[in-house]
């Protein structure tokens, strides 16, 4: 199960099959369920309870674009622990939000993304100190590239942006879940 934002949903992909969960499914043979909730991936307790009812092999939390840094700080531990209660051994993968092109000309947006990524890194560390096992963290690493061609609007990946994200995500996910991905 992959939970997150409009980015995950594939809001600006040329077609639904170009969003990264669909492409992960095609290249692995596993079903990556896309629960991208355009603008609403805010880690609410009720959503955690709903996700916990799903018999999943793994949970990928790619929701950091939507909540504020304060919401991330206030909600992450409870969200992960709600999943962990029903899935004590299931891998949980947390992904930082991608750096948005809009931050190149909007300093407030740039600072918000920086604070979101710092907040989620801090909360993952809190969870690790609580000995939450099978918790993984994918740090933002130029997910969209550096040539300013990976989005349609400075935020949402186009097909090229999804290609670039997918390459980085596949490397991490294949190591964590021991999945072999085929070339697309």
Can you annotate each of these PLM segments?
Residues 16, 24, 41-86, 97-104:
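Oxyanion-hole/transition-state-stabilizing segment in secreted/luminal serine hydrolases
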Residues 20, 75, 79, 116-123:
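A general structural detector for well-ordered alpha-helical segments in enzyme core domains, enriched
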Residues 28-33, 55-58, 88-92, 132-135:
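Loop/turn elements at helix/coil->beta-strand transitions in domains of secreted/extracellular proteins
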Residues 100-138, 164, 183:
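Substrate-gating cap/lid alpha-helix
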Residues 152-184:
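Histidine-centered active-site loop/cap adjacent to the catalytic His
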